[in-house]
């Protein structure tokens, strides 16, 4: 695991160092950020061992890819399985606006909650439950069957439990789970598959 974040992208050297200190003969790298994929691919070319880069763009994609890994399969089979699962992952995030702006037809004010769905702005509001309901509806409309809600460091467990119930109401056909992710910046990271 390499520490990073939205503004702390690891370099090719950081990734290569992590690869080289791993005792595995074959290393799978999950960037979990579109801005890190090229650095991971460059590190893979420089590594002294076999490296497979799975082009994960979000943490939910990375989790899904990890769950698709099977130690009994050949590396090429794992690469195919891990990569194939990515297209079925809907990634939703709730964060906040740092400043006033207009974007994609949304009038955004500093402090507003921002809802993102697969990287696109899906809504903005002062009321987080409105945004959660909207994202739950998107998952239900897309026919997603498994939803994992990772709540961040700034969310109280009772609020996260309320979000879980809201998702269960809006997406009644899905299995919905709640996990304390403890992540900064994002109040919620939501994976729907």
Question: Residue spans of the language-model regions?
Answer:
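N-terminal loops that bind phosphate or other acidic moieties
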Residues: 1-193
């Amino acid at each position: 695991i390499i520490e990073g974040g939205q503004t702390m992208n690891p370099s090719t050297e950081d990734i290569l160092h992590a690869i080289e200190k791993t005792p595995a003969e074959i290393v799978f790298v999950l960037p979990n950020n579109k801005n890190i994929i090229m650095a991971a691919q460059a590190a893979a070319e420089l590594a002294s061992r076999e490296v497979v880069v799975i082009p994960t763009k979000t943490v939910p994609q990375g989790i899904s890819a990890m769950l698709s890994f099977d130690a009994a399969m050949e590396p090429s089979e794992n690469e195919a399985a891990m990569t194939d699962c990515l297209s079925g992952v809907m990634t939703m995030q709730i964060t906040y606006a740092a400043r006033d702006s207009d974007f994609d037809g949304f009038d955004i004010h500093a402090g507003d909650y921002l809802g993102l769905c697969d990287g696109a702005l899906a809504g903005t509001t002062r009321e987080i439950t409105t945004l959660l309901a909207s994202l739950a509806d998107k998952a239900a409309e897309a026919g997603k069957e498994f939803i994992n809600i990772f709540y961040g460091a700034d969310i109280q467990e009772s609020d996260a439990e309320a979000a879980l119930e809201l998702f269960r109401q809006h997406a009644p056909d899905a299995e919905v789970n709640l996990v304390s992710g403890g992540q900064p910046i994002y109040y919620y990271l939501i994976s729907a598959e």
